[in-house]
Amino acid sequence: DFHFEAGRTYKIRIEFVNDRRGARVIFGYSAGWENFSAAVEAARKADVAILCMGDNEETSGENFDRTDLNLPGRQLELVQAVYATGTPVVLVLQSGRPVTANWENDHLPAILEAWFPGEQGGTAIAKTLFGNAAPGGRLPITFPRSVGQIPCHYSRRPGGGKRYVEMDWLPLYPFGYGLTYTTFAYSDMTLSRSVIGPQDTVTVSVTVTNTGKYTGDAVPQLYVRDMFSSVVKPERQLAAFRRLTLAPGESRRVELTIGPKQLRTLGPDYV
């Protein structure tokens, strides 16, 4: 790393040997970390601090390998410095990968995963944070606590052990996880039948009630597990889901139907 002073001109010579196909030179610079104190002071005077952290095209994308899944660089240091002011912190993650946000999860009151949201992402994030829209998405991947848990996809096959020496074996955020500005209760679940044939379907019905103070989207999810398969099957598989918007106090009956397509298995003879 080289330090460049403002107002001075520097001559830079780069020597590069291309010893493999597809090699390239990337020249860039960092604005430095002198604004840490300015950010901390601004947060100290604010009612709420919104920190947008995460990746860009240089740190996350196709054909990128990583040795850790933490926030890049010194981003966590900035988050911790702002948190130390006592001002409530909302963390907006913009990333194309899971983040091992253990400290952030334990200390911050709100985390919004925005992924790489595109040119109108700022508008969508602002509407969500200011209450004009309620978050309703559910994670399509699993967020591990550490790279040592990888692979930790939700549909993993049964293994011998579920314990680590230094941490919980459960992921930080499981597949299908997600919060919104309200709460929901599920009750009166019933099955249309208890036994089905090879070509039959079964419908699971459940009542979903918005028990909070705000309108929000509930996402009932139905998972299946084969307890007596002739081949090793995942511990659970997503078979069906619905997304519905409920006003405060509103209840609705939801039906999720599954059949041979969701329950079939490729046998040991590939039939």
Predicted regions and their residues:
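Solvent-exposed, conformationally flexible loop/turn segments
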Residues: G7, P198-Q199, L246-S251
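Acidic/polar, compositionally biased interaction segments
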Residues: D1-V48, E57, D65, N70-Q75, ...
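Hydrophobic beta-strand positions in extracellular immunoglobulin-like domains
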Residues: F16, V208-N210, I258
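Loop/turn elements at helix/coil->beta-strand transitions in domains of secreted/extracellular proteins
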Residues: R44-A49, T85-V90, H107-P109, P135-G137
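Secreted, periplasmic, or luminal enzymes acting at the cell surface/secretory milieu
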Residues: Q94-D217, Y223, P268-V271
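Intrinsically disordered, low-complexity Pro/Gly/Ser/Thr-rich segments with frequent PxxP/GP/PP motifs
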Residues: S230-Y270
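Structural beta-sheet core signal
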Residues: I14, L51, L91-L93, I141
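Short acidic, flexible loop segments centered on an aromatic residue
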Residues: K213-S230, R236-L238
